[in-house]
Amino acid sequence: MTMTDPIADMLSRVRNASNAFHDSVTMPSSKLKAHIAEILKQEGYIEDFAVNDRKDGKAGKELEITLKYGPTRERALAGVRRVSKPGLRVYTKSTNLPKVLGGLGVAIISTSHGLLTDREASNKGVGGEVLAYVW
């Protein structure tokens, strides 16, 4: 069966694994998912990620994300929300970039310069499609 929104699936898997206090989560990989994982790592929401060959021997790659927790096992990733969906795309101008929790969270934006956080997009003066909010 074809997946209609692979980004929402990725974010749901990460959120569910974090809520269940799993050490890592595995999912089918793509370039876009790897870029999102890179942003999550840069912003300190996940420990690490790796793109590996599938363990079952089938064609394709899988993305393994190692989740991050504090010293007393508190979650680094408090919440995540998919904004732009296949049925309703959400775009923003560079002058209207969203702030997540007053700047405490991060908006992931797909721009002509690649995937950027809201702060990076503001510095470069570009807008784009708002993919997700992470806090």
Curated annotation (Swiss-Prot):
Name this polypeptide is given: Small ribosomal subunit protein uS8
Keyword DNA damage in record: no
One Gene Ontology CC term in the entry: ribonucleoprotein complex
Quaternary state and interactors: Part of the 30S ribosomal subunit. Contacts proteins S5 and S12.
Role of this protein: One of the primary rRNA binding proteins, it binds directly to 16S rRNA central domain where it helps coordinate assembly of the platform of the 30S subunit.
Keywords, sorted A to Z: Ribonucleoprotein, Ribosomal protein, RNA-binding, rRNA-binding
Highest taxon of the lineage: Bacteria
Example of a GO biological process term: translation
Homology family: Belongs to the universal ribosomal protein uS8 family.
